[in-house]
Amino acid sequence: MLLSRNLRALAAIHLWIVYLLLEDLLGTCAEGDNQRLVASAPYQDIEITLEKPRVQAVAEPHTLRYDLMALSLEVPGLPQFLTLRYFDDEPFLPYKKNSSITDSQEPRIKDHLRAETWGRETDDLQEEEEQLKGMLAEITAQNGQNTDLHILQATFGCELQRNGSTRGFWKLGYDGQNFLTFDQKTLTWTVDGPSTQKNKTFWKTRAPRADLVKTFLDDICPAQLQRYLASLRNGLLNTGFPKVIVTFRNYPVGRITLTCRAFRLYTRVATLTWLQYRKPVQQKTFGSETILPSGDGTYQAWVSIRVLPGQESQFSCNLKHGNHNINEPAATEAPVYGARREQPPTSGVGSRVGKSLWSAMTTALVVISWTLSQKLMGPLLWFCSGGFCSFLQCW
């Protein structure tokens, strides 16, 4: 017997919430060119009080992104409205409807922003909720769908590129499908996928006003991004200097593996170099695609090299990171072969222990989600496209 559409939609919402929670903990599941579903936009006029940031080259690109979701009906155990904010793909400041808690997952950002700035950021979440709910209510009413469960999603933000310029992005999605994308060059909305002229007109007339979207993408978002970036720079006082640690491990094949690990990296660019008699023999430069998050807003990296027993004292590891140039010798005392020097514990999901725990949690949640989908909806096929994960039902 086929189950009702509402029951199927409810199961889909559960799976989508699981994805959001996993992404909140582990980061995005796929890299993309900011091709995420995006939510509603402000309808009322916005008074611009932010000064447009100066164009200044940066060592690496930075991104500020907002992911919003609204449900057309209340579902027990699920938030009717959810907002996630990401700085360089790391979540902070989650907001859920029916919850009085709006706290930053990146405390250094909150600590170094002025109180009035942080309050304004929090108040904006309430406005975004009302705007998104209003848009969803209008869409479902026009289509005669106000008795069914539907989802309206939004993704928007901006990227600071290496040459100092910025570009914005804004997308809207309905029931897991992209339907509107804002073109920042032409200042127009385009309907994704094939559609009749009537449907195109319907969606475009309900999209956020182009002038307000332009103001947000050109002025407000870049200014917020610059503030967050400055906040993290100031946060270096809390994290201290980068830390370099060298460990070794003896293998029975007559070689020793030296591993150089760098912690407390405050940007996603670093270079680790193995030196023998102070001359480089192996070098690796880490960027946004290869460096690892530590889970506390900083990053870490490592590089290994194999040497003959007795050569440890010839080697040292060099870290170049921002204005820091740190050298760490490979051996300050005679190693005990066959043993492994104890490594200091690391905090956050970037550590090995953290990764194993989160891996176990991921497996459990996937099994639960799969079981739920089998019982309520039949098999589901998950897919990741352009950084946004969704699913297809296999009938």
From Swiss-Prot:
Post-translational modification: N-glycosylated.
Main location: membrane
Region called Alpha-3, residue ranges: 241-337
Disordered: annotated span: 332-352
Keywords attached to this entry: Cell membrane, Disulfide bond, Glycoprotein, GPI-anchor, Lipoprotein, Membrane, Signal
Record has Iron as a keyword: no
Residues annotated as glycosylated: N98, N163, N199
Membrane topology, record value: Lipid-anchor; GPI-anchor
Signal peptide span: 1-32
Tissue localization of expression: Expressed in stomach, intestine, uterus, skeletal muscle and heart.
Database matches in SUPFAM superfamilies: Immunoglobulin (SSF48726), MHC antigen-recognition domain (SSF54452)
Ig-like C1-type domain mapped to chain residues: 242-333
Family the entry assigns: Belongs to the MHC class I family.
Subunit relationships: Heterodimer with B2M.
Protein name: MHC class I-like protein MILL1
Lineage: Eukaryota, Metazoa, Chordata, Craniata, Vertebrata
Gene name of the encoded protein: Mill1
